[in-house]
Amino acid sequence: MTLIKSISGIRGTIGGQAGDTLNPLDIVKFTAAYATFIRYSKQSESNTIVVGRDARISGEMVKNIVCGTLMGMGYDVLNIGLATTPTTELAVRMSKAAGGIIITASHNPRHWNALKLLNQEGEFLTKDNGNEVLEIAEKENFEFSDVDHLGKYTEDSTFNQRHIESVLALKLVDREAIRNAHFKVAVDAINSVGGIILPELLKALGVEYTMINGEPNGDFAHNPEPLAQNLGGIMSEIGKGGYDLGIVVDPDVDRLAFICEDGKMFGEEYTLVSVADYVLSHTPGNTVSNLSSTRALRDVTERHGGVYTASAVGEVNVTTKMKEVNAVIGGEGNGGVIYPESHYGRDALVGIALFLSSLAQKGCKVSELRATFPEYFIAKNRIDLTASTDVDAILEKVKEQYGKQADVKVTDIDGVKLDFPDKWVHLRKSNTEPIIRVYSEASTMEEADALGKKLMQVVYDMQ
């Protein structure tokens, strides 16, 4: 069974039996549940729902079912075609729609797909709203329209350009400095929608580029998660020389990673750190990232006189906390940049434009820019448990044990995070399988891994 239901939507592998995978019957059920929620929540007077998708092989099939179901529920559909996640988010806001559905499984392999659900602001649903949709779907408590009240279908392919124009209009995007820098970059678009929109953005910025895996056919050339072990091709290309940097995105272009001019990874955790440093140097203020993200953002924020706040993991949790503390920038350590001057969503186009602006103004190499930030390393481990294990009870014991130590700050808004003076470890339970994910950070990878292993042993001893 691969069908995973969450507050942000549903995802699963294509094919199989109803209830077990992402198949036509479940796509209809959850689309109808979402449409029912939108209608009865009365958050918008619009009768239009935006639909956009990445270039996955299954995307055309899923899109047809989603659009037909929405029309059957009486909603007008605005299909913006092949589009990034942030483009679709912006399209909801620009068109004053009632909501939006993004068809993408983000960094998951090619045989996966998903429905991601947006509110009228083009932002992901809150936990309470998401649970309402799941409850409606579970009860199949929806009613389709009669023949006289079916929705209409419209296509609009202009939102890619409108997205680019909105990025170029941001005050901190220094188009002149970027153009004068004469950057030459390599781009890995992982055979998805980045191959459509990133060339247009780079041309508008006056950047010379070489596309790798640029054909948006959904047949991903490698594992689509933008991590070093998956990026041998572009790292090798840049290592040959002649490039100022490499740009890597995931299939729906909400995650962003950079590669230094020498072919080495800039570090996905440092995408947000570097962009935040640039933004804070021009507009001092507060920042937010999730509990599993690098401490380097806190250090950079405090250096600029701001206050850093951690949120629970998940984009909607980050954006909610950003609004609470009036953060000028935030995001997630997986390469997700959220810049409220644009919109409250992870956006690789915004990240690219701000990063290039910073690099152009500083006049340095990417590796030199990376060296200006605090050096931390994150280790990732997991604890496999039995289905009968009371994970919450274990996490409570960890909290109690370390809460007695004066030099440890304990945070329990999302699992348990233990902040030591010079390192941290975060334990989170999975919502879909009996495991605890263990993230740890320190000044060396060896120390980070040792800390994670130590907490793993603590958990084993508690069983």
Regions found by a protein language model. Give the residues of each.
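Short glycine-centered, acidic/aromatic-flanked micro-motifs in structured strand/loop junctions
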Residues: 52-53, 187-189, 260, 341, ...
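Short beta-strand-to-turn element immediately C-terminal to the catalytic PLP-Schiff-base lysine
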Residues: 117-120, 257-261, 338-340
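Gly/Ser/Thr-enriched, mixed-charge loops and adjacent short helices
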Residues: 13, 113-239
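N-terminal small/polar loop signature for handling phosphorylated ligands or for N-terminal nucleophile
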Residues: 36, 48-112, 200-259
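Proline/glycine-rich low-complexity loops and linkers
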Residues: 71, 131-165, 169, 260-333, ...
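Phosphate-binding and adjacent anionic-ligand microenvironments
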Residues: 245, 283-463
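An N-terminal, well-structured beta->alpha segment
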Residues: 1-73, 152-185
